[in-house]
């Protein structure tokens, strides 16, 4: 799956055409009030660009929450239509469904350049292909119904644009099922692909990956794939304790230990050696007597280990120095997962120091990419999103890319040629 060879919105001629844009308007709601409109704002450049190029009409489609294949007013996109009108400064016609006669009739009578927002795609089981019954058991959608649903979505479009990177790892109907000749990436999707291509297809070296997070078992595939690509790998966060216990027989007290992941540590370290990857682990820790923002704190080195009833919640000053040295050497950096419990101020120093080093690296012209999820939250919390090369909008999608998996939503896009 090539990331750098996908058709982009700028390669399209949309004049007089019916344009379908899959956006990510999965915004947090409090009742009918949108509490954060960032995802809507992020989609504006693509919508405005298409609108400026005189399409017949634009149809916007998204999911919101998990309505589980049935209509549920709690997950209606109606409030999004109102917000979008404000942001665009023009009328947005909200349709009460995403397929069916009402939708067909509305688009057939569209005024030139009209913008429609469809109701939540996930009101139909055919979007995700399955739902859960009241006992939590998976119920599969009828394949014929899925086919019909996809045909109905396709009938609204001459051109398809996908700007929902956060859902790109899901083979949902609106992501892979529109059979039109040109399927292009919107500006958000294009930026994601461009930066991940810079890291995964043709990185400037030295290439450093920074991994944090709790469980080794969640990140085995990620570490395994990155060991074929990087020159240096920092393993921090909770999963460092599993590595330290297995490799150095270090006492870790009540720190996180991942029984399942532990079985893979030696194989991963062997692979790092074989591939000449410098593996960098923390050598000292900020410890706590409990998992709490008001915990008593102490410090421990890896030579002493962490005493019983204490746990490591951040890396210590010597580790910070090691990590900063690696960052200073690197020309390409991918960071997924914080090195400490940054949510508690007492254990945020490791994360803040690493973030400062990453910002400095980006300011020096290096490529610094933050995978979505917790690390993106860190970048937002400390107000440095604009200072880094790229902060991904898709936690799960960016993780699967870094694991070396193909993303169905990207595979479905047309290639440039």
Swiss-Prot record:
CDD domains, A to Z: Phosphoglycerate_kinase
UniProt binding sites for (2R)-3-phosphoglycerate: 23-26, 38-39, 62-63, 65-66, 121-122, 169-170
Pathway field: Carbohydrate degradation; glycolysis; pyruvate from D-glyceraldehyde 3-phosphate: step 2/5
Top-rank taxon, per record: Eukaryota
CC terms in the record's Gene Ontology section: cell surface; cytoplasm; cytosol; external side of plasma membrane; extracellular region; fungal biofilm matrix; fungal-type cell wall; hyphal cell wall
Compartmental location: Cytoplasm; Secreted, Cell wall; Mitochondrion
Subunit structure: Monomer.
Protein name per UniProt: Phosphoglycerate kinase
Origin species: Candida albicans (strain SC5314 / ATCC MYA-2876)
């Amino acid at each position: 799956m090539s990331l750098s060879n996908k058709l982009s919105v700028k390669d399209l001629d949309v004049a007089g055409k019916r344009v379908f844009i899959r956006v990510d308007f999965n915004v947090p709601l409090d009742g009918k009030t949108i509490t954060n409109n960032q995802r809507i704002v992020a989609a504006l450049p693509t919508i405005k660009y298409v609108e400026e190029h005189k399409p017949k009409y634009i149809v916007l489609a998204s999911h919101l929450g998990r309505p589980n294949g049935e209509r549920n007013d709690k997950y209606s996109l109606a409030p999004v239509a109102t917000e979008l009108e404000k942001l665009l400064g023009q009328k947005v016609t909200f349709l009460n469904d995403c397929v069916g006669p009402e939708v067909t009739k509305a688009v057939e009578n569209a005024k030139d350049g009209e913008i429609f927002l469809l109701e939540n795609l996930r009101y139909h089981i055919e979007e995700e292909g399955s739902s859960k019954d009241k006992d939590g058991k998976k119920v599969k959608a009828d394949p014929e119904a899925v086919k019909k649903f996809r045909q109905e979505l396709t009938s609204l479009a001459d051109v398809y644009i996908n700007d929902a990177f956060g859902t790109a790892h899901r083979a949902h109907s609106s992501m892979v099922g529109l059979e039109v000749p040109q399927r292009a990436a919107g500006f958000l999707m294009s930026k994601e692909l461009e930066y991940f291509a810079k890291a995964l297809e043709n990185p400037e070296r030295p290439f450093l990956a920074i991994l944090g997070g709790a469980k080794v078992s969640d990140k085995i595939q990620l570490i395994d794939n990155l060991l074929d690509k990087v020159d240096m790998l920092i393993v921090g966060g909770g999963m460092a304790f599993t590595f330290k216990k297995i490799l150095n027989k270090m006492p870790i007290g009540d720190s996180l230990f991942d029984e399942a992941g532990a079985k893979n540590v030696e194989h991963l370290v062997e692979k790092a050696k074989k591939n000449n990857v410098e593996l960098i682990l923390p050598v000292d820790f900020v410890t706590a007597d409990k998992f709490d923002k008001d915990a008593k704190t102490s410090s421990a080195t890896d030579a002493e280990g962490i005493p019983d009833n204490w746990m490591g919640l951040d890396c210590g000053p010597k580790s910070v120095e090691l990590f900063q040295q690696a960052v200073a050497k690197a020309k390409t950096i991918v960071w997924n997962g914080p090195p400490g419990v940054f949510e508690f101020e007492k254990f945020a120093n490791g994360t803040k120091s690493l973030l400062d080093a990453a910002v400095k690296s980006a300011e020096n012209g290096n490529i610094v990419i933050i995978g979505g999820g917790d690390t993106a939250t860190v970048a937002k919390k400390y107000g440095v999103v604009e200072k880094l090369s790229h902060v991904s909008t898709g936690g799960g999608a960016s993780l699967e890319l870094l694991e070396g998996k193909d993303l169905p939503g990207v595979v479905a896009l047309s290639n440039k040629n």
